[in-house]
Amino acid sequence: MTTATTPKGERRRQALVAAAAELLLEGGFDAVRHRSVASRADLPLASTTYYFESLEDLIARAVEFSGAIELDAMRRRVGEVSHRRRGTDATVDLVLDLLVGPDDSDLDARGQLIARYERSVASARHPELREVQLRLRTQLEELLADVLRRSDRVVRPEQLRRLVAVVDGAVVAALIEGHPEPRRPARAGLLEMIDIVAPPVVPNMMPQQLERARQLD
């Protein structure tokens, strides 16, 4: 593998990463091969081994690329959220906009959702993917904490992870069962717990008390 030290080399490297990310979305990990990536990027076959140490390295970069695009979209969504007190339903819908998407009945959105969970499951077997997924998950949790703060709610780190786990479990089960709208069972699960794991801020709570509530184990 040769580092892409020139502008042309960097463009080629990014083209290969983007091509691999497209193939991941369309066909999963089995679709990502040296030849298919080079063909999609319209580059010589040897370029995949020239710019990347291995196919696993290329896949890891593609996963990071896809995750970064999703996180950028989530940041834009969070940036649109005003800071005000929200009820249970409104808060749950905001959380699901980030974790599931606003419209899971759309075929493209459903494909992206499936690809996201495929990447998560694959990281259990591949250390290079695990590191990428953990970095992406940390950023996702920060965005979730932000949107909950903007909804005038308080959440501790371990409770935030519990919230994500409930959504993950509901969505994966719905996808396995062929549910046309995975967001619906995830919403039902969150409605039962959101006020417990991320309760509304108590009126007149002092800043020190609020920070302690967020950090308390």
Task: Set out the residue ranges of the language-model regions.
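Short Lys/Arg-rich basic patches
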Residues: T5-T6
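N-terminal positioning helix adjacent to the helix-turn-helix/winged-helix DNA-binding module
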Residues: R12-A15, A19, Q159
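Helix-turn-helix
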Residues: A15, L23-R61
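Short, basic, alpha-helical segments at the C-terminal edge of helix-turn-helix-like DNA-binding modules
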Residues: E64-E70
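Hydrophobic alpha-helical connector segments
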Residues: D72-L113, L160-L163, R187
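Short loop-to-helix capping motifs
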Residues: A122-P127
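Hydrophobic/aromatic-rich alpha-helical bundle segments in the mid-to-C-terminal region
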Residues: L129-R130, L134, R149-A213, D217
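Short, solvent-exposed amphipathic helices
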Residues: V132-Q139, L143
